[in-house]
UniProtKB/Swiss-Prot annotation:
InterPro entries hit by this protein: Ribosomal_bS6, Ribosomal_bS6_sf, Ribosomal_S6_plastid/chlpt, Transl_elong_EF1B/ribsomal_bS6
A molecular-function term among this protein's GO annotations: structural constituent of ribosome
Disulfide bonds: none
GO BP term, pick one: translation
Organism: Chlamydia felis (strain Fe/C-56)
Name the UniProt record assigns to this protein: Small ribosomal subunit protein bS6
Record keywords, A-Z: Ribonucleoprotein, Ribosomal protein, RNA-binding, rRNA-binding
């Protein structure tokens, strides 16, 4: 039997600022446990904190940003997206294939 190959992904998640710290932790745990339940592995989580949104989403002007690096079989992504759409605490999400886990996030300064 052929072994299924996993792919490395970078997931960006924006949670509602109306969540308490405990509720936000549980919402993040719901996302990570979903990945693990489908046979995935969490490699790195970057907590990017509270940031202003580019535009209003469901009345929110700010959100808590997390960047998660994980590996999973590619066919699982569609199932994860279904779960994400049902998660009311999650304002937005984006999942991209990537080649490497970034240990440190660096951002360029905006020009003056």
């Amino acid at each position: 039997m052929k072994e299924k190959t996993t792919q490395l992904y970078e997931g960006a998640y924006v949670f509602s600022v109306t969540l308490s710290e405990e509720a936000r932790r549980k919402a993040l745990e719901k996302v990570t446990s979903g990945i693990i339940n489908y046979g995935g592995e969490i490699l790195k989580i970057h907590d990017q904190g509270r940031k202003k949104l580019a535009y209003t989403i469901r009345g929110a002007r700010e959100g808590y940003y997390y960047l998660i690096y994980f590996s999973v079989v590619p066919g699982v992504i569609a199932e994860l997206w279904k779960e994400y759409h049902l998660n009311e605490d999650l304002l937005r999400f984006l999942t991209l294939k990537t080649d490497a886990v970034k240990e440190v996030l660096e951002f360029a300064s905006l020009p003056e």
